[in-house]
UniProtKB/Swiss-Prot annotation:
Family according to the record: Belongs to the glutamyl-tRNA reductase family.
EC number: 1.2.1.70
Protein name, UniProt field: Glutamyl-tRNA reductase
Protein's gene: hemA
Top-level EC class: oxidoreductase
Source organism per UniProt: Methanococcus maripaludis (strain C7 / ATCC BAA-1331)
Domain notes: Possesses an unusual extended V-shaped dimeric structure with each monomer consisting of three distinct domains arranged along a curved 'spinal' alpha-helix. The N-terminal catalytic domain specifically recognizes the glutamate moiety of the substrate. The second domain is the NADPH-binding domain, and the third C-terminal domain is responsible for dimerization.
Amino acid sequence: MLVVKADYKKYPIPVLEKMRIDEDEFYKKYEACVVVQTCNRIEAYFDTEVNSNVDDILKDFQGFDILKGKNATFHFLKVSCGMDSMILGENQILGQIKTSFQKAREFKKTSRYLDSLFLKAIHVGQRARTETKINEGGVSIGSAAVELAEKNFGLTNRNVLLIGAGEIGTLVAKALVEKHIKAVIVANRTYERAETLAKELKGMAVHFDKLREAVNFSDVIICATSSPHYILEKEDLIDVGNKIIIDIANPRDVDDSVRELENIELYTIDDLRNISDKNLQRRIEEIPTVEKIIEEEYDVLMKQIEKINVEEVLKEFNTYIEEIRVKELEKAIKLSKSKDPEEIMENFSKAFAKRITHDFVSYSLNTSKEDLMNSAWWKNGK
């Protein structure tokens, strides 16, 4: 297997956005392949048994990191468990892998090997999340904000206002997706960005000049802009009813004097750091258990792949035998009118055996002893 990859560890998000693969064009060009793309990573997986043009692939993906064989497989299993994610153990990557795999199958671009790999990766990701706590507790400031709101106020059937649709706002949005919220409103100075994020949340976007109305409508307000000045001040919140406000912006979006209002509970980024740090430490402690699951499932996958390889060789071998049989039978039929049937059968069987022996000896002489002993044909022949 071959993997070409670019991710947040090497490139900033704006650069990754420019490196994104046009999936329709990708699937037109390559066989036996799957592309997995998220906001933080771009990866393409190739079955090299089908794609022998590895050099051409590498030319097409200059700037991408390259992984092959065992390293590529282990990498993908770690990705499925969220161990290679910006947020350790995050759940979203598993759904993205499933969606990517399904799209490749719709294009009829997978292979028996890639089918086995992706189904195994999905299974490993599920095991990691059910048998360990690698995905429990919010570890980003965004998810910690949502966790705090849920713990202190409850989010079921609440109206949530997210102010800010940048990087931090997006992290908040990811954490909100999994909650049973009545309504989500996204406000941002650039309305188009608010609209894009609101679609992901199945919510609604509002223009910034409608912020007052959105505040009145909301139960929970999460502020995550990059504004150099306050977005909400004391006079904005005097008669808006009971609200919980979580300000995770830096610099702050909410004037601290808001704490003087009895109807407002204000939390800042300092209140969240303890939550996220403790949760991250708990997730880190689960890494050895997840790695053990990956190693176990890798061994199972290799046995599945070996079986596939043997089946493919047997299929080719049967085709090869059948071709010889048909050719020798045609010769025998031509001779059947002029020779003794017993002699014809004798000659047919000898010619058949001689042809197989000749081809096997030729294969053996042109193959190293090590390769011969490791070949599925030899193992099966023994």
